[in-house]
């Protein structure tokens, strides 16, 4: 072969290699990735401490190399190296692990948030839906609502309205009138402060509607209103406020009788609110004649069953304890006293826990001593049993010698 032929062959080989490089961009990316990973490997090896030796050093190098490889494999899509290995084969294992880790992290964060405050998540309570205060959103949380125990923290389910009326109809006065039956003391106080004339109107309306109230006779001879009885059951079902577990309620040594008595006297006024079961003609769909006929029939039934002395209904105004206003000195002192009481109860719990811990350690040490003494007694018993066997053999030998003295 001549020199000219060699030049032609070398030129054709160079052009073929260039065409191969242009036609195989995956190979070029693999070479570039290999060079970058090698450079990263060298820099990591130079930055390691000199005191790392043996397997720890190799393990750290492998971890760093895997980290850089995963970063290159899952880089931005513009780089053109997403999901490819050194050989150009797509790798889905690392991406699956990263997505799985992200899903696990989100699930763990959501579970921790639900454990901290489960009533703030509407996704879990939307299916149940029948509990009071179950659909509280994060956007509606305000400081006034949290401190005042207002809406939407006290929400009455619409199905609870059916148990208030005798005929199964919905209570026509709406949610605001039902808050005196179901709601908390703060809502009752707020309604009294906002509407000071509502009590007088309610009492006058009560005096006019006492004639149409259905009164049932109990076996003990006491009067009982059917609407009040059903409303008490409704109060028990829908009394779902935020009752947190405090150290005061868990402490076995804390004296909380005065506080509980005060709470009972405050909450007793909620059940004394009268309920009128007479409904307007538009709500029931009947005429005025039907209502008058129903009232006359109820009067006849009451007159035939109950004496006239027992038909007198005494209207008692609801007893509601007035709490101190917010951001005042009395309110602050009440909060300070409550905090002090909780601190004292927490210290009591800590002392009880320390006492139990000391008694547990003392019992453990005594148990160890008794086990050690038991082992010593077992060893001594085994030694005595061995000596007893030796003495038995010696007695047998001496008896044989006494029987045969010639030997």
Curated annotation (Swiss-Prot):
The entry's keywords: Cytoplasm, Nucleus
GO CC, sorted alphabetically, is:
cytoplasm; nucleus
Where found, per UniProt?
Cytoplasm; Nucleus
Chief place where the protein resides: cytoplasm
**Role, per record:** Involved in cation homeostasis and in the regulation of the cation stress signaling cascades.
**Name assigned to this protein:** Protein ATC1/LIC4
Q: What is the lineage of its organism?
A: Eukaryota, Fungi, Dikarya, Ascomycota, Saccharomycotina
Gene from which the chain derives: ATC1
């Amino acid at each position: 072969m001549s020199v000219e032929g060699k030049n032609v062959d070398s030129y054709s080989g160079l052009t073929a290699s260039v065409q191969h490089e242009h036609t195989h961009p995956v190979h070029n990316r693999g070479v570039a990735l290999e060079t970058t990973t090698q450079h990263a490997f060298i820099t990591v090896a130079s930055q390691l401490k000199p005191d790392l030796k043996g397997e720890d050093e190799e393990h750290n190098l492998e971890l760093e190399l895997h980290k850089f490889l995963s970063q290159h494999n899952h880089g931005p899509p513009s780089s053109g190296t997403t999901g490819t290995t050194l050989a150009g084969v797509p790798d889905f294992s690392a991406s699956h692990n990263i997505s799985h880790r992200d899903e696990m992290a989100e699930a763990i964060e959501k579970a921790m948030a639900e454990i901290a405050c489960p009533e703030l998540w509407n996704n879990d309570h939307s299916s149940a839906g029948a509990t009071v205060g179950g659909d509280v959103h994060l956007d509606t949380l305000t400081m006034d609502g949290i401190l005042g125990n207002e809406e939407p923290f006290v929400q009455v389910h619409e199905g609870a309205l059916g148990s208030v009326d005798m005929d199964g109809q919905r209570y026509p006065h709406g949610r605001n009138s039902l808050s005196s039956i179901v709601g908390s003391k703060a809502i009752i106080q707020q309604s009294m402060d906002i509407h000071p004339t509502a009590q007088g109107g309610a009492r006058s309306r009560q005096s006019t509607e006492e004639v149409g109230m259905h009164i049932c006779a109990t076996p003990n001879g006491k009067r009982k209103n059917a609407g009040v009885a059903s409303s008490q059951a409704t109060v028990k079902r829908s009394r779902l406020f935020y009752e947190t577990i405090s150290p005061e309620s868990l402490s076995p040594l804390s004296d909380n009788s005065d506080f509980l008595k005060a709470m009972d006297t405050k909450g007793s006024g909620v059940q004394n609110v009268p309920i009128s079961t007479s409904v307007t003609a538009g709500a029931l769909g009947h005429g005025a004649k039907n209502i008058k006929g129903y009232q006359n029939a109820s009067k006849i039934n009451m007159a035939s069953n109950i004496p006239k002395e027992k038909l007198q209904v005494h209207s008692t105004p609801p007893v509601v304890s007035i709490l101190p206003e917010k951001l005042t000195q009395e309110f602050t002192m009440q909060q300070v006293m409550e905090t002090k009481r909780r601190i004292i109860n927490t210290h009591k719990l800590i002392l009880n826990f320390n006492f139990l811990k000391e008694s547990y350690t003392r019992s453990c040490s005594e148990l160890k001593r008794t086990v050690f003494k038991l082992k010593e007694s077992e060893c001594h018993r085994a030694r005595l049993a061995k000596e007893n066997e030796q003495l038995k053999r010696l007695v047998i030998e001496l008896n044989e010698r006494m029987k045969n003295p010639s030997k």
